[in-house]
Amino acid sequence: KPSGCGEQNMINFYPNVL
C-alpha cells in the first residue's frame, strides 16, 4: 500500500495529495 496516502491520514492529512 502507498505510504502516506492512506496511512494515518488523520495525522498526515494526505501529504502526498496536498
From Swiss-Prot:
Subcellular location: Secreted
Family annotation (InterPro entries): MacrogloblnA2_CS (IPR019742)
Superkingdom of the organism of origin: Eukaryota
Keywords: Bait region, Disulfide bond, Protease inhibitor, Secreted, Serine protease inhibitor, Thioester bond
GO MF, one example: serine-type endopeptidase inhibitor activity
Function: Is able to inhibit all four classes of proteinases by a unique 'trapping' mechanism. This protein has a peptide stretch, called the 'bait region' which contains specific cleavage sites for different proteinases. When a proteinase cleaves the bait region, a conformational change is induced in the protein which traps the proteinase. The entrapped enzyme remains active against low molecular weight substrates (activity against high molecular weight substrates is greatly reduced).
Homology family: Belongs to the protease inhibitor I39 (alpha-2-macroglobulin) family.
Protein name: Alpha-2-macroglobulin homolog
Species, as recorded: Octopus vulgaris
